[in-house]
Amino acid sequence: MNPRRKKRLGIVLAIFIGISATIGLMLYALNQNMDLFYTPTELVNGKPDGTKPEVGQRLRIGGMVVEGSVRRDPESLKVSFDLHDVGPKVTIVYEGILPDLFREGQGIVAQGVLEDATTVKAFEVLAKHDEEYMPPEIAEAMKKTHEPLQYTTEQKQGSGQ
């Protein structure tokens, strides 16, 4: 092989390796930032396709805050509450200031890490906008696997916290 061909081959290989490394790093970064959405029932029982999150996995979970389940630590901003759809309850632990629209009986979406089978340590809690709004992920998941929730007048008005 003459020197000119060797040089071209080296350049082509370097470009190929560079592009491959870039694509690999992009896919790795995308996979690390992907948070799958679950309802409390799907978190406990698994999704219909059999997937179930592992302890330590980042995820998003959406559902309704159970009435009377909000527990606040008087010495810190730590709050824990139960979340449900129409099945099992999941405990959410959050340290920070909750959104103004957060209240018992309202829908929320929490983003966090699964600590054990029924506990999520959230680093972000989002409250729904009004009593008629339901996040698209929750509405779609509930249409597929659950009966729609019927709100009482008390739930629609809020708990008055």
From Swiss-Prot:
GO terms for biological process: cytochrome complex assembly. It is a single-pass type II membrane protein. Signal peptide: none annotated. Heme binds at residues 129, 133. The keyword Nucleotide-binding does not apply. It is found in: Cell inner membrane. Gene3D superfamilies: Nucleic acid-binding proteins. Keywords: Cell inner membrane, Cell membrane, Cytochrome c-type biogenesis, Heme, Iron, Membrane, Metal-binding, Signal-anchor, Transmembrane, Transmembrane helix. Residues 30-161 are periplasmic. Residues 1-8 are cytoplasmic. Its main location: membrane. This is Cytochrome c-type biogenesis protein CcmE.
